[in-house]
């Protein structure tokens, strides 16, 4: 791989490419063109070629891309050969739904534990995942070597929990709360604001003719 910084927009598209390549591989297909890949993942072929160029020569002009080789390359790039243990913080409505989600699009992600304050849930096994009390969170994070946490708790409690997660050694947080959180530089936070996404979608529906496409 070339020694250079990969744009965030490119990094966000890599799982999309990988999942489609895996699907092609499962159906026995041997090669794919950038045009075919573009139509399937709805990313223009020029962007795909530019994304791939950050990783060196991945295909051959006039031939396309070898599905298995490209799939294996992105699997390694996305650390699909390493199991990442994930903790879920908050087993409310959204948290419960995420516990039921099997992360079927990746064999390398496993929610191994969950934490909550609700005494009716704590101590139970929900969809095969043990739910611990919040006071056990830091200890279990360390014992189970958790690197990533999903946050689905009330926004007012989020920063306090993030501070503890960072202290316990968590390196990445997927934040479903409305709070904008502060963490040490070595901890990455990715925000998923469902209300914001829905409001943005509604805006697009009503202002479609006014929008100008911007390339990420």
From Swiss-Prot:
Name the record gives this protein: Redox-sensing transcriptional repressor Rex 1
Lineage: Bacteria, Bacillati, Bacillota, Bacilli, Lactobacillales
SMART domains: CoA_binding
Major subcellular site: cytoplasm
Lipoprotein as UniProt keyword: no
Subunit structure: Homodimer.
Gene Ontology CC entries for this record: cytoplasm
Keywords: Cytoplasm, DNA-binding, NAD, Repressor, Transcription, Transcription regulation
Species whose genome carries this gene: Enterococcus faecalis (strain ATCC 700802 / V583)
Keyword Transcription among record annotations: yes
Gene: rex1
Sample GO molecular function, one term: DNA-binding transcription factor activity
Chain residues forming the annotated DNA-binding region: 16-55
Residue positions binding NAD(+): 90-95
Function per UniProt: Modulates transcription in response to changes in cellular NADH/NAD(+) redox state.
Domain of life: Bacteria
SUPFAM superfamilies documented for this protein: NAD(P)-binding Rossmann-fold domains, Winged helix' DNA-binding domain
């Amino acid at each position: 791989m070339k020694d250079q910084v990969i744009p965030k927009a490119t990094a966000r598209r890599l799982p999309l490419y990988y999942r489609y390549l895996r699907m092609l591989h499962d159906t026995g297909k041997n090669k794919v063109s950038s045009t075919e890949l573009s139509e399937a993942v709805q990313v223009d072929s020029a962007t795909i070629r530019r994304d791939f160029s950050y990783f060196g020569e991945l295909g051959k002009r006039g031939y396309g891309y070898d599905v298995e080789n490209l799939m294996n390359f992105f699997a390694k790039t996305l650390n699909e050969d390493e199991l990442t243990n994930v903790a879920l913080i908050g087993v409310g409505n959204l948290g419960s739904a995420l516990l039921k989600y099997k992360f079927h699009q990746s064999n390398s992600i496993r929610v191994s534990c969950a934490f909550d304050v609700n005494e009716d849930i704590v101590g139970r096994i929900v969809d095969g995942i043990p739910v611990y009390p919040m006071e056990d969170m830091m200890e279990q994070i360390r014992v189970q070597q958790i690197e990533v946490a999903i946050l689905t708790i009330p926004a007012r409690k989020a920063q306090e929990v993030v501070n503890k997660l960072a202290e316990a050694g968590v390196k990445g947080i997927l934040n479903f709360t409305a709070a904008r959180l502060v963490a040490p530089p070595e901890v990455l936070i990715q925000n998923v604001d469902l209300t914001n996404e829905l409001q943005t979608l509604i805006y697009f529906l009503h202002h479609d003719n006014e929008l100008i496409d911007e390339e990420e």
